Amino acid sequence: MSRQKTLDLLATGKTLWNKWRREDAEVQAFEPDLHGADLHGMDLHEADLTEANLQEADLREADLRETDLRHADLRSANLSDAHLLRARLHGADLRGANLCRTNLQGADLSNADLRGADLDGAILDKANFDEANVSRRDLGEADPNTPLKAKEQRAGSVALLDVKAA
């Protein structure tokens, strides 16, 4: 399916999108190509974006509550001010993503790669960072009220943290 057709289908709404992803056998093996898409402010609450290519996508202020983004490619995506409450981001690639002021309360970021992601001002309350790949500098000015447990590991000259909300 062409990138434009994928965008057009997503624009019809999450209900039709999720039905299409769930019921069409050919689609179940399909990784949606939304690379560089302008999804600014879009309501994608509970959408199935599993394994989607959202690299460099504009998701500013998008409603991604409870959205399934497992194993999605979100490298260099702009998610600033997005709402990701209870979003499923297990195994997602968020390297270089802008997560400034993003609400990640209760989100599952286990096994996610967040190296180089900007989490300044992010709300991380009850977010699961189990086995996530995050460096100290990536946490920046993330919500200081979020109790995080971190286990430092060394990989070359970079200090990596396995971070998990307490």
Q: For each of these PLM feature ranges, what is it?
A:
Residues 1-12:
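P-loop NTP-binding cores centered on the Walker
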Residues 8, 16, 21-166:
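Tandem repeat scaffolds
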